Amino acid sequence: MSYTRTVHSSTSILKMNSALQISCLLVVLGCLLGSGHCQSEAEFAAKSREIAQMFGNPSVDKYTKARNLPALLAFYEKYSSRLRLTPQERNSVNNAMRQYKAQRNQQVDGVSAQGGWLFDIIKSAISIIVKAVE
């Protein structure tokens, strides 16, 4: 009787261990990224509904909308790439946001600008964003 003995070199075992470790790492990363994407999708959907309810609802008064403009700005800055906007709409919204921020940062006697006229600056941008999230 003859016995055949397979001899594995130490380098082939190391290569196999490395490949196994890398594949496990890739699986873990895939799971983490996938769950993160799902969470961000759910967050985007929830924030979109909030924005649409706040700014798309004609029964919400102008002052409530003006008070919530920072939330709209934050939403647009975070999710602008997910909104289906034409290049012209995107440019219009970006210009309105820049103008709003410039006016908001302007101070008179050390006090930021007050009043509802700031809301009028980005009124068209609001309608574009609301249309995109609905």
Swiss-Prot record:
GO terms for cellular component: extracellular space. Residues 1-38 form the signal peptide. Keywords: Immunity, Innate immunity, Secreted, Signal. One of its GO terms (biological process) is cellular response to UV. It is found in: Secreted. It comes from the Eukaryota. Belongs to the Turandot family. A humoral factor that may play a role in stress tolerance. This is Protein Turandot E. It comes from Drosophila simulans (Fruit fly).
